[in-house]
C-alpha cells in the first residue's frame, strides 16, 4: 500500500490493477480521511490517467447495488460537474424532455458537491422520489420512460468518501467516475466533461466498459452543449472514436450570451426550469436544452441534428414535459 501511495505523491500514474486495489480499500473504509484527501488532491493536480479511471470504476461497481438488466436500448445523460459554470441543470431538464420524446432514460444522479445545485437537489424540488426501490424505479422506467438512480442509494460505500469530497469542495476523480458508474450500465450515454483533456480518455473508458454508442461533450469550460460557443464532441460508435466540433448553426439555432443560462439555488433553478418546461421560458434556455436533447436523440440513430432540435423544441413548447414531471412526482 505504501508503494502505491508513494507513486501518487511522486506524481506517477497508477496501473489499472494498482488503482483497483487502492479503490477497494477506499470503498471499504480502510483509507483514512487525511490519506484520502491527499490522494484525491495529488491525482487532481497531476491529472487522471485512463488506467486509473477504469480501475476506480471497476472497484466502485464491485461494491454497488445492481439495477435490473433491460431488454431495450436506454441511455443516461450526465455531466461530471466541477466546471464552476453555475448554469441551470441542463442535463436533468434534457432528460425530462428526452423521456417525453419517447426515449428510455436511466439517469444516475447525486446532490451537489462542488456546485450550487446538483441534479438531485433539483429533483427534490420537483417532489420526485429519490429513494424509490429498484422495483418502483423499473416500473417508472417502463411506464414513464425515465427513472432516477440516487447515487448514495446504489453506492452505499460512498459514505466513506462523502465527507472528504464535501470538505475539499474541488473536483476530484469522483467527478469523472459519476457518469461511468451508473448501476444500470446504459448502452447509450451522453456525457459532459469539465475539460477537453478528459474527452478522449472518457470515450476510451466507455469503450472498455462496452458502451454501444456514447457522445462526450465540452463547451467553454462547461460540461454540456452550449449556445454561447462551439461544442467539442468525441463520439464512440461501432468501437470507433472520432472527434469534431459543433456550433449553434449545426442545430439550426442562434448564439446566445453565456449569462442567459446561469442558475442559482435549487429553488431558483426549479422555478426557471418549471417555467421553461411548461413551454413559457426564455428561448436561450429552451434552445440550450433542445440541442442537448438533439445529441441524445442521435444516440438512438436520429442523425439529423436540426430535425432533432426542432422535435425537442416542439415538445418543450407543448408543455407536455411538465405534465411528465407531474406524473413522475405522483408515481
UniProtKB/Swiss-Prot annotation:
Write the record's keywords in alphabetical order, separated by commas: Amino-acid biosynthesis, Aromatic amino acid biosynthesis, Glycosyltransferase, Magnesium, Metal-binding, Transferase, Tryptophan biosynthesis
Pfam families according to UniProt: Glycos_trans_3N (PF02885), Glycos_transf_3 (PF00591)
Query: Where 5-phospho-alpha-D-ribose 1-diphosphate is bound, by residue?
Result: 79, 82-83, 87, 89-92, 107-115, 119
Instruction: Report the catalytic activity.
Output: N-(5-phospho-beta-D-ribosyl)anthranilate + diphosphate = 5-phospho-alpha-D-ribose 1-diphosphate + anthranilate
Binding residues annotated for Mg(2+) 1, in chain numbering? 91, 224
Q: Name one GO biological process term.
A: L-tryptophan biosynthetic process
The top EC class, named as a word, is transferase
For the keyword Mitochondrion, the answer is no
Name of the protein:
Anthranilate phosphoribosyltransferase
Q: Which family does it belong to?
A: Belongs to the anthranilate phosphoribosyltransferase family.
Its cofactor is: Mg(2+)
Organism source for this protein?
Answer: Buchnera aphidicola subsp. Schlechtendalia chinensis
From the UniProt record, which GO molecular function terms apply? anthranilate phosphoribosyltransferase activity; magnesium ion binding
The UniProt entry's GO CC annotations, sorted and at most eight, read: cytosol
User: Binding of anthranilate 2: at which residues?
Assistant: 165
Quaternary structure and partners: Homodimer.
Q: State the protein's purpose.
A: Catalyzes the transfer of the phosphoribosyl group of 5-phosphorylribose-1-pyrophosphate (PRPP) to anthranilate to yield N-(5'-phosphoribosyl)-anthranilate (PRA).
Q: In which pathway does it act?
A: Amino-acid biosynthesis; L-tryptophan biosynthesis; L-tryptophan from chorismate: step 2/5
Amino acid at each position: 500500500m505504501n508503494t502505491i501511495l508513494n507513486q501518487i505523491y511522486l506524481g506517477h500514474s497508477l496501473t489499472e490493477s494498482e488503482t483497483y486495489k487502492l479503490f477497494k480499500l477506499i470503498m471499504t473504509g480502510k483509507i483514512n480521511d487525511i490519506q484520502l484527501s491527499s490522494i484525491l488532491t495529488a491525482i487532481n493536480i497531476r491529472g487522471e490517467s485512463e488506467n486509473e479511471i477504469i480501475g476506480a470504476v471497476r472497484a466502485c461497481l464491485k461494491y454497488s447495488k445492481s439495477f435490473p438488466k433491460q431488454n431495450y436500448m436506454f441511455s443516461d445523460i450526465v455531466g461530471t460537474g466541477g466546471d464552476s459554470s453555475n448554469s441551470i441543470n441542463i442535463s436533468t431538464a434534457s432528460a425530462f424532455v428526452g423521456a417525453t420524446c419517447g426515449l428510455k432514460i436511466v439517469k444516475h444522479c447525486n446532490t451537489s458537491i462542488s456546485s450550487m445545485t446538483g441534479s438531485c437537489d433539483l429533483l427534490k424540488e420537483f417532489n420526485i422520489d429519490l429513494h424509490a426501490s429498484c422495483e418502483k424505479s423499473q416500473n417508472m422506467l417502463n411506464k414513464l420512460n425515465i427513472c432516477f438512480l440516487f447515487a448514495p442509494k446504489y453506492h452505499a460505500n460512498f459514505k466513506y468518501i462523502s465527507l472528504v469530497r464535501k470538505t475539499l469542495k474541488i473536483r476530484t476523480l469522483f467527478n469523472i467516475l459519476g457518469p461511468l458508474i451508473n448501476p444500470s450500465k446504459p448502452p447509450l450515454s451522453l456525457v459532459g466533461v469539465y475539460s477537453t483533456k478528459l474527452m478522449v480518455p472518457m470515450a476510451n473508458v466507455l469503450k472498455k466498459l462496452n458502451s454501444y454508442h456514447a457522445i462526450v461533450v465540452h463547451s467553454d469550460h462547461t460540461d454540456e452543449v452550449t449556445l454561447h460557443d462551439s461544442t467539442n464532441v468525441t463520439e464512440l460508435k461501432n468501437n470507433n472514436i472520432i472527434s469534431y466540433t459543433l456550433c449553434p448553426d449545426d442545430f439550426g439555432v442562434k448564439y446566445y450570451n453565456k449569462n442567459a443560462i446561469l442558475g442559482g439555488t435549487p429553488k431558483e433553478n426549479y422555478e426557471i426550469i418549471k417555467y421553461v418546461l411548461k413551454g413559457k421560458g426564455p428561448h436561450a434556455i429552451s434552445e440550450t436544452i433542445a440541442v442537448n436533447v438533439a445529441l441524445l436523440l442521435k444516440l438512438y440513430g436520429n442523425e439529423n441534428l436540426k430535425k432533432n432540435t426542432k422535435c425537442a423544441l416542439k415538445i418543450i413548447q407543448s408543455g407536455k414535459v411538465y405534465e411528465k414531471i407531474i406524473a413522475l412526482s405522483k408515481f
